[in-house]
């Protein structure tokens, strides 16, 4: 039984339209994530141990984007990497933590080091552990909380209600993450963005498209569907 038809990035093309823009240099895709910090490039590198450490985070900042330092290391090593990134003078530094174990200790060390965004990094974000973690982090630290991953309007609304400031939308379907294929759960990425953009929430919670983005055209489609930022691990 088909519950409903959904759209993936491959199912969609944007219609070419008339323009009076004289140069691509005139186009701005800049967006805020944390309060007061404008990103010229709405792209975030994924918190994977093969993707984002100091060199990638520094390069992303130089390009106008953001890198999220992965959590698959010791607290001391993750803090050291973040300090190295911040030493370049760019205030934008994000780092991933979990929702169990040492996550509060890790969060404390990272915030003390100057990290402005903590990414609560789990495969299935619509979970009681995520709710507890978001509320604990927000009650203890003055920090932007990026949470996820989710794929439905209801899950987006719940994470926003729990206190998340930005939410990663997308379950699997990426070049590395295979959650959708391994578990049989998920919604095509383009559809997830459309649904979450229509969420009934009372404040500005940023949508981060994550997963299933294979080309620069997919990034454009994600932004057109309502995403504020796009997260990628490879392309």
Each predicted region: which residue ranges?
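An N-cap/entry alpha-helix motif that binds or orients negatively charged groups
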Residues: 1-43
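Generic, well-ordered alpha-helical segments
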Residues: 37-40, 48, 52
